[in-house]
From Swiss-Prot:
Name of protein: Major capsid protein
Keywords: DNA-binding, Virion
Disulfide bond residue pairs: none
Lineage: Viruses, Adnaviria, Zilligvirae, Taleaviricota, Tokiviricetes
Function: Self-assembles to form a helical, filamentous nucleocapsid. The capsid proteins wrap around the DNA and maintain it in an A-form by non-specific desolvation and specific coordination of the DNA phosphate groups by positively charged residues. This certainly protects the viral DNA under conditions such as the extreme desiccation of its host.
Pfam families: Sulf_coat_C
Length: 134
């Protein structure tokens, strides 16, 4: 579900690094890394799953409103998750606007996506059809 990078605090990053670093002194490195990193990764996953689940639900509602059915829904669901990951990673502002504009251009040319629906998806995720959240 939540694929890619999600925002993490310094303490979360340090906890995961420390779990990996301490494992390298053990001969069974792989199993030690997995057992040490597992709680940190699980906590990060549990923190971020609700965000991305709500994105899927909100985008699904928009797609139903526009009458998009079948496999075409996957195009817009994928776009919505990319926008949500970008918002989660880089926050709002000009960088997000540039990323959204690039993604929209790509989805329009590669998947023949409807620009109005893409704008509605951006609006439901960011609160603004342009992606700029002040």
């Amino acid at each position: 579900m939540a694929k890619g990078h999600t925002s993490r605090s310094y303490s979360q990053r340090y906890a995961k690094w420390q779990a990996k670093f301490n494992a390298f002194s053990n001969p069974t490195v792989a199993s030690t890394i997995l057992s040490n990193v597992s709680p940190v990764a699980q906590q990060n996953f549990q923190t971020n799953v609700p965000k991305f689940t709500s994105v899927n639900e909100n985008v699904s509602a928009v797609l139903t409103q526009y009458g998009i059915t079948g496999p075409n829904r996957a195009i817009y669901q994928g776009f919505g998750l990319k926008v949500a990951r970008a918002l989660n990673r880089i926050g709002s502002g000009p960088a997000l606007v540039n990323m959204i504009n690039g993604l929209k251009g790509y989805y329009i040319s590669a998947f023949n996506a409807n620009p109005q629906v893409l704008d509605a998806v951006v609006n439901i995720i960011t609160g603004s059809p342009t992606g700029y959240v002040s």
